[in-house]
Amino acid sequence: MTTYPHKALLLALATATVAASLTATAAPAVARPAPAAPQLDWHRCTHPDAPAAQECAELPVPLDYDDPDGRQLTLAVSRIRSDRPGTRRGTLVVIPGGPGGSGVQRLTQKGDALRRELAGAYDLVAFDPRGVGASTTASCDLAPEDRYLTSLRSWPGPNGEITENIARSRRIAEACARSGGPELRSFTTANQVRDMDRFREALGEQKLSAWGTSYGTYVGAVYAQKYPRRTDRWVLDSSGDPDPKRVARGWLANMSQGAADRLPDFAAWATHPDRDRDGLRLAAAAQEVEPLVVSLAARLDREPRTTTTPGVPLTGNGLRQALQNALYADAAFAPFARLVQAAQDPAATPVLPKELAAPIRNEDAALMVSVICNDVAWPDASAASYRRAVDADRARYPLTAGMPVNVLPCAFWQTPVQKPTRITDDGPSNILMLQSRRDPATPLSGGLKMREALGDRARLVTVEQGGHGLYLGNGNACGDRAVTEFLTSGRRPARDTDCAN
């Protein structure tokens, strides 16, 4: 998928403390003296699957931008240079989803295809945000049972019970406050944006172009708000609502509607006659698929199935999370169908998806939690208010069973220093948005809110497609052409448009 469902708490979408220069009105930053841009010592990347053309380096950035000469963190950065220097027009930064996505790995996965698609028009660059991958990390020292994805996603217990969710959320917040240190408090969208501009300086570029996906669209939007004159051609692929009141918590809540929008695509696939040939047909008619999955999850709530992973059964919430992940891309439909079949067959032993079979690394869990909790103040709501929200969401959206509105560690987090950035139409008209009509993580409704906020700065291409993350992934030829043409020629549709093919 184009974001990272096994490594990210929201869209992966999440947030952290916004520092002083990002105000509630998000005016462009006032220039002030900064340390000289560091030199990047490029070398061949050594991580698995890195293409021969991919180079890596390390970039020092301030822990605290109010103390730029103080303690420094290290970011892993990467590039794939244009193979056509005569046609190169600039540098394009690939902004990963998340929070929790690795820019370096994203460039490994997409770099060769992107370089071919853009015909060498750009040097392609990316970095691991602070807290991610080979960059400086932090840990909350969480117990393994608190680091499973079905724990971090705060799925309610059977019948919507949230007592354990409340206890776990408080436990995680206290552990992060105790063990995370100043590094963890620095894991914010605002600092990722500052780090990206520091990377621009180190590259010697006056401007950057960008392709941001999922949570990366929010990072991209904040950068374009803070540094509007340093943006060239800006692509936001699969956006959420940027309203400061909706950041993080609202993104997660929207996943209930997103799953409902996307499920018909899976249901049609799972009941197509072609599934008879590969033995994966789940029902006779598409309308039978949702009740089948909901009832199977309820059965697994009562009677979890032993799996091929010792000590980790398939629970109802495990099935629900596996479905949520599968809805990101059509390619994941078949593995989920096999899981459903095995869960129904008393003679079979279900095989858990790898993202559910083991605890997430402590460093990844810390990043996932901290960014969403640091960026914005979450309501310190009562247990009763969360129970009401979960009950209402479970009734309306049985596939997600109340998880998207449930309590998270953010309810027990320290109060952030600043308000999040407000995205506005103040800036150059150089943004192209790409949005799926049936996105399980960033529903079209949220993308339309981003479009409204950007005003004449943006044009929106809505793709008649399901899945999350479109360009060179889950999209269609029409949407891909629109992005490629914009990045290579600067031409955008004159007005918002739909892409049916």
What is each PLM-predicted segment?
Residues 265-266, 318-323, 335-338:
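A general alpha-helix detector
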Residues 32-318, 370-501:
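Gly/Pro-rich cap/lid or specificity-loop segments adjacent to the active site
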Residues 344-376, 380:
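Long, low-complexity segments enriched in small/aliphatic residues
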Residues 26, 340-342, 389-394:
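Short linear, low-complexity motifs centered on an aromatic residue
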